Amino acid sequence: VDELIKDLRSHEKLIKISDDTLDDLPVFVKKPNYDRSKLKPGIVHIGLGNFHRAHQAWYLHRLMQRGEALDWAIVGAGIMAFDKEQRQKLLSQDCLTTLVELDPDGQSVEVIGSMIDYVEITDGNSALIERMIQSDIKIISLTVTEGGYFQDPNTGDLDCTHPDIQFDAGNTQSPKTVFGAIVEALRLRRLQRNGPVTLQSCDNLQGNGNILRKTVVSLAKMSDPSLASWIDENCSFPNSMVDCIVPATGRTEIDIVKSLGIKDTAPVTHENFRQWVIEDNFCAGRPAWEKVGVTMSDDVHAFETMKICLLNAGHQILANAGEILELQTIDECMAHNEIFSLFDTVQRDEIAPHVDDVPGMTPEQYLQLISKRFANPKIKDTVRRVAFDGGARHSGFVHPTIRKAIASGSKIEGLALVEALWARMCEGTRENGSVIKPNDPSWASYQEIAKRAKNTPCVWLDETHDYGDIAQNEAFRAIFTEQLDRIWSHGVKSAIVHYCSSDP
């Protein structure tokens, strides 16, 4: 393969991926062996980012390579400005995607073809609604990020006061949000007797199916209580755990694909690990994902807890400290002595004790696995990407463990330090004086509070609206205050060393 790549680099012409050029791709590129013209849609997926294409779309592609699930092809959809550009890119290459697996021992390349169309993005989401009501669609799946569910951070319920939710409740036929579009589509499916569908969240949220159910049913109830009852009683919302590290695509990733002789305007790079655990709860059928490595289970809670509390929380430990010290990527954070010590100590001493075993994996084994994955030098997963939307990520990934630790009287010093590092990062400057660009939907508010917390640390707990009952715990308040004071007085490295060298 290396010799073939060298030969390709000597030629300037790139092969633009399309149905017509699949046979022209280099011999080392794996490609669809099925007739894509015979694929039929079965899934509408909202949120065609990199993760979906490297994960869910890949699993479906693997089934299609076996000659199965040919009537479960994906129709892409979205409602954001990004989605319009993404739609143009993917349609220009027949909805094919080049996946490059980056392993420390080498790389492999695959073009997947499980997606066949991309819904036009229109005002009022009329085209999306129209596609979701068609009887051939059996699953509506989503990757809209952890912060995209309009949750009240303290209660976990739908924030019915949010302006976009208020708008959708009063303008059901021309909604702004994904969830408003789903509610309207379900109303029409019910009216036209096209049957219920499975609504499948693929986001990093514990109980993501339960959260999606609550969001959709609560929004429907605001305008049509009988519809809300029909949705709750007839549609299914399976919980799932998803896992694969997928960096954002930038110039580096596009250049990697070009070096292979391929022109793809929206390629995806990913690590050599995937996991998908799904609650087997589908009201209108599903692909046989278990044939290609997906774990179908009656209970995914233990898998979710292990992944969210160790991997996702671990990402926040690394990224917040790394941003303050101007590190660029997660593998750089893992190679940084103090940051790695913080990551390893907090995980082993304060998070892992609250995580149960899952079949075939203990928390200790899982920590070893994710440490190896995070340290992969080929995956240039940026600190900025991982630290984005800290409000949603700390609330969803770190705070559940803090609550467990408080309730059990366990150690919280490291967890408090992690939260203090987030507050320090949100102040907006690094230790070298450089400015951190806004990186959160609520950045302006967080930054204003973080600046005041420099002198009065508990302001951060009291006014960010992310902590709820945690902010009322006197022990946590005292330790958080101590940790943030130490960060500002002595620096991040000193604060970490002090914590890691303290008696257990």
Residue ranges and their predicted role:
Residues 1-504:
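Substrate/ligand-engaging "lid" and interaction regions
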